[in-house]
Amino acid sequence: MALKIRLARAGSKKRPYYHVVVADVRAPRDGRFIETVGSWNPVLPKDAERVKLDAERIQHWIAQGAQPTDRVLRFLDQAGIAKRPSRNNPTKGEPGKKAQERLALAKQAEEEAAAKAAEAAAAAAAPAEEAASE
């Protein structure tokens, strides 16, 4: 039986409240669970009352093979119960391939326009110099 430590939604409409539960992965999100090991109230400001966790029981279930979900793992990392691996995605902020192609084309067109403008300026200055030297 595969176990997850995950969030089960409670609370009313537009007023979310979550229980941190240990449940079988096949069980419905808000349905059957094995044990409640904490709670999270996202409506509260960021303080100690916002996330409540039973560290001893969570460590017990992790030792039994329960896997925390991403959001729960964030809470466990903040509480110092479990370590969340850091993510490294250095290309996240870069534009996509097509956007990079468009930027390269725009830069090339800009360079060509600048070269033509410089060439035209040089051509315009050249006849004036010839007239002055005669």
Swiss-Prot record:
The gene is rpsP. The keyword Ribonucleoprotein applies. Pfam families: Ribosomal_S16. One of its GO terms (cellular component) is cytoplasm. This is Small ribosomal subunit protein bS16. Residues 79-134 are annotated as: Disordered. It comes from Brucella canis (strain ATCC 23365 / NCTC 10854 / RM-666). Residues 115-134 have a biased composition (Low complexity). GO terms for biological process: translation. Belongs to the bacterial ribosomal protein bS16 family. GO terms for molecular function: structural constituent of ribosome. Keywords: Ribonucleoprotein, Ribosomal protein.
